[in-house]
Amino acid sequence: MSAGRGTKPAPRSGNRTPKQRAGDAAEQAALHHLEAHGCRLVARNARYPEGELDLIVRERDVLVFVEVRMRRSAAFGGAAASVDVFKQKRLARAAQHWLLQHCGQRWPACRFDVVCVQADGTMEWIRNAFAA
């Protein structure tokens, strides 16, 4: 896939804040987890005015938009609860932009997943986390 609007290379380690570095590490851990389960990376950190798509992977014939969430504790519902309806709508609009840019009018089967990375390194992969 060519670099351009809506894509960027793997996370940088330069002048990143500790929170950004932790987020980069969570995304990388989530990607390894997904790849270990047969997914193939299509794009990462695709940015649009509506928001950022953390990971885009292909699982068999399905294009999967993956939101990676990291939380230090399960307080306030944990990582999964932080993907509220507002965030879901932003992700859906960003995904529409990505699909139009990369797939034109022939959209593949798609879904939205959430990978929750806990502070202790455990992960929960929520397939079909929400519908758009």
Locations of the language-model features?
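Hydrophobic residues on conserved beta-strands that form the core of alpha/beta folds
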Residues: 41-43, 65, 112
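Acidic-basic catalytic patches of nuclease active cores, encompassing PD-(D/E)XK
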Residues: 1-44
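Domain-level recognition of nuclease-like catalytic cores that cleave nucleotide substrates
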Residues: 4-6, 101-132
